[in-house]
C-alpha cells in the first residue's frame, strides 16, 4: 500500500502554481526562478534613447528614465578617445564643474549630451557662433527682459561649441543669419542685460543695426570709442553748433572743404601758407570779440592760424595768452597737449575746447616725423616775412629784384645799416663773416703779406657765407667808388694803389682783425666785443670759390 502510494505522483496544489507564475512575471527577463540576478543593475545609467525620445522598451527598460540621475564620468572621455561622442550614455563632463580646453563649460556639455541629436543638429547649423556666457548671470530689470532672456538662454544652450566638430569655425567668424527652430537670429548680436531694450530707446543711437529681431533683442555693435565718450562728444558739439550736426559731421565736412589741399604738409606750400604772428593775433581777437561761443570749437580756418609763437632767436619763445576759451601756445608743446580731432591734427594742431572729451580720435594720425614738423611749424616774424618773402624761392627772387632795381634807381635805400657799412664784401657778391667767435682777446704772429701804407691792413675774418647775403646789397652810383676801393683794400684782391684813407670812416671796424706790421713781423689783435648774430634769418653755409 505504501509502495503504491509512492508510485502515484502527487498532484500539486493549483494555488501554488498561480503564485509561481505571478513571481516569474514580476522578475526581469534575465532573472532566473530562484530570484538571483545574473547581470548588473543598470538603473543608475540613464537611457540614451529616452533622452532622444526614441526608447521603445518603456517600463521594461533596464536603464533609468530619470533626467535627474547623476551619470558617472566616461573614462574614455577623460582620455580623449571616446568613440560615441555626444551619444555616449556616460557623462562627458570634467570633475569639479570646470571648463573644457576649448572654453565650453561642463554645464553646457551636459545640456548638449542631454539633448542628444537635437544639440548636434543645432551645433551644425550654428557652427561655432557662441553667445556671451554672462547672459544667464545677468539680472533682468523688468518682466519683458526676463521673457527675452529665456529665449536667448535656450538658444545659448543649443549653440555652444562642441569638441566633436573639429572643423567648426572660430567664434569670431560667422556667416550672416542662422535659423533655429524656424526663428531668425543674428550671430554675436544677442543682447546682454544692459543692451536688451526696445527699439524706441535706440532712436538717438549711432548704431545702424536694429535692436530687436523677431522678439530676440540684439545688441548694438561696438563703437570706435566708448559709447559714453562718443555721446558726450556728440552732445557737446551739437550744443556749441546750436544744431543737430555732431562731431563726426564736422570731420567729414572739414575733409571736403576748400582747405583740404592746404592741409597736406609740403615744404614750399607750408612756407607759402604761413601767416605772420600779428595777423594771427588780430584774427583770434576778432573771433573772440564777435562770437565767444564759437571760440571753443575747432577752427575751420587754415590750420596754421592758431600758431602764434614769435621766433626772435634760436630758442623759440612761448607765448601763452588767454583769449576767451582759447589757450594759445607755440611749437611742439602745443601739439602734444591739444586733443586731436582729425588725421591732420598731428601736423597742424588746432585749438579745441577743454570741455570736449580727449579720447575722441576717429582717424589715425599722420606718420610724419617730429623733425620735419618742427621745421615746418617754425613761424616767421612779420618783419622777416615782409622783407624776405614767405618761401625760399620768394626770398631769392625778392633779393635779386632788389639788386637789379638798385642798378637803375640810385636813390634806393638799403635794407639795413650794417649791410653797407660792412667791410666783408667781395667782388663775388657774398659777405665773408666769422665762422666762429673768439672768446677773449688774443694775439698771433704772422708774416707780413705785403708792404702797405701806414703799415695797416684789413683782413677777412673767415670763408663762410650767410644765406641772406647770397646777393650783395644794392650798389648805388654814389657808393660805387667806395665799393671799388673796398675791394682793392682786401689782401686777397689787393693792388699796389690801395690806401688806408679809402677804407676809413666806412663803419665801425673795431671787431675786425687789424694787422700792424713792425720790422717784418705783423701781429693780429682780435677784440671780444662781437654781438651775437641773429640766427633766426641768417644761416651759415660753406662758400667755395672756383679757380
UniProtKB/Swiss-Prot annotation:
The keyword Repeat applies. Residues 1-37, 132-176, 526-547 are annotated as: Disordered. The modification Phosphothreonine is found at residue 502. A zinc finger (C3H1-type) spans 41-67, 68-95. The modification Phosphoserine is found at residues 343, 353, 355, 483, 489, 495, 499. Residues 537-547 have a biased composition (Acidic residues). The keyword Zinc-finger applies. Pfam families: zf-CCCH, zf-CCCH_4. Residues 24-37, 147-162, 526-536 have a biased composition (Polar residues). One of its GO terms (cellular component) is nucleus. PANTHER family: C3H1-TYPE DOMAIN-CONTAINING PROTEIN (PTHR11224:SF58), MAKORIN-RELATED (PTHR11224). This is Uncharacterized protein C1739.01.
Amino acid at each position: 500500500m505504501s509502495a503504491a502510494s509512492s508510485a502515484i505522483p502527487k498532484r500539486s496544489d493549483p494555488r501554488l502554481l498561480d503564485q509561481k507564475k505571478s513571481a516569474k512575471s514580476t522578475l526581469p527577463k534575465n532573472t532566473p526562478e530562484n530570484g538571483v540576478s545574473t547581470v548588473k543593475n543598470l538603473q543608475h545609467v540613464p537611457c540614451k534613447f529616452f533622452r532622444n525620445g526614441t526608447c521603445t522598451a518603456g517600463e521594461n527598460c533596464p536603464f533609468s528614465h530619470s533626467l535627474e540621475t547623476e551619470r558617472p564620468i566616461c573614462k574614455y572621455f577623460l582620455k580623449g578617445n571616446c568613440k560615441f561622442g555626444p551619444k555616449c550614455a556616460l557623462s562627458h563632463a570634467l570633475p569639479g564643474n570646470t571648463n573644457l580646453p576649448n572654453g565650453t563649460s561642463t554645464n553646457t556639455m551636459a545640456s548638449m549630451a542631454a539633448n542628444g541629436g537635437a544639440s548636434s543638429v543645432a551645433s551644425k547649423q550654428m557652427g561655432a557662433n557662441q553667445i556671451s556666457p554672462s547672459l544667464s548671470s545677468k539680472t533682468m530689470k523688468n518682466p519683458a527682459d526676463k521673457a527675452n532672456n529665456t529665449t536667448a538662454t535656450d538658444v545659448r544652450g543649443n549653440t555652444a561649441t562642441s569638441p566633436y566638430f573639429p572643423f567648426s569655425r572660430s567664434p569670431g567668424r560667422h556667416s550672416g543669419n542662422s535659423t533655429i527652430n524656424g526663428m531668425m537670429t543674428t550671430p554675436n548680436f544677442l543682447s546682454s542685460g544692459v543692451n536688451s531694450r526696445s527699439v524706441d530707446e535706440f532712436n538717438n543711437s549711432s548704431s545702424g543695426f536694429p535692436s530687436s529681431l523677431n522678439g530676440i533683442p540684439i545688441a548694438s555693435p561696438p563703437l570706435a570709442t566708448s559709447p559714453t565718450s562718443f555721446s558726450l562728444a556728440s552732445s557737446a558739439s551739437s550744443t556749441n553748433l546750436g544744431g543737430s550736426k555732431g562731431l563726426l559731421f564736422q570731420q567729414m565736412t572739414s575733409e571736403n572743404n576748400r582747405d583740404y589741399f592746404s592741409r597736406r604738409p609740403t615744404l614750399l606750400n607750408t612756407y607759402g601758407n604761413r601767416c605772420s604772428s600779428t595777423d594771427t593775433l588780430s584774427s583770434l581777437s576778432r573771433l573772440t570779440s564777435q562770437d565767444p561761443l564759437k571760440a571753443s570749437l575747432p577752427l575751420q580756418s587754415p590750420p596754421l592760424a592758431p600758431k602764434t609763437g614769435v621766433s626772435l632767436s634760436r630758442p623759440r619763445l612761448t607765448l601763452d595768452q588767454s583769449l576767451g576759451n582759447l589757450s594759445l601756445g607755440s611749437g611742439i608743446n602745443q601739439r602734444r597737449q591739444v586733443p586731436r580731432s582729425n588725421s591732420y591734427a598731428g601736423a597742424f594742431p588746432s585749438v579745441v575746447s577743454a570741455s570736449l572729451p580727449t579720447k575722441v580720435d576717429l582717424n589715425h594720425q599722420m606718420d610724419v616725423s617730429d623733425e620735419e614738423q618742427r621745421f615746418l611749424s617754425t613761424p616767421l616774424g612779420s618783419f622777416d616775412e615782409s622783407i624776405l618773402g614767405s618761401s625760399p624761392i620768394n626770398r631769392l627772387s625778392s633779393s635779386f629784384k632788389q639788386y637789379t632795381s638798385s642798378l637803375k634807381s640810385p636813390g634806393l635805400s638799403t635794407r639795413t645799416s650794417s649791410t653797407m657799412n660792412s667791410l666783408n664784401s667781395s667782388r663775388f657778391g657774398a659777405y665773408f663773416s666769422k665762422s666762429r667767435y673768439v672768446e677773449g682777446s688774443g694775439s698771433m704772429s704772422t708774416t707780413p703779406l705785403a708792404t702797405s701804407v701806414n703799415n695797416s691792413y684789413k683782413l677777412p675774418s673767415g670763408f663762410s657765407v650767410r644765406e641772406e647775403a647770397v646777393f650783395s646789397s644794392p650798389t648805388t652810383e654814389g657808393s660805387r667808388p667806395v665799393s671799388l676801393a673796398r675791394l682793392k683794400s682786401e689782401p686777397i684782391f689787393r693792388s699796389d694803389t690801395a690806401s688806408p684813407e679809402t677804407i676809413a670812416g666806412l663803419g665801425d671796424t673795431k671787431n675786425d682783425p687789424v694787422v700792424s706790421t713792425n720790422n717784418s713781423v705783423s701781429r693780429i689783435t682780435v677784440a671780444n666785443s662781437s654781438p651775437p648774430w641773429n640766427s633766426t634769418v641768417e644761416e651759415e653755409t660753406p662758400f667755395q670759390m672756383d679757380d
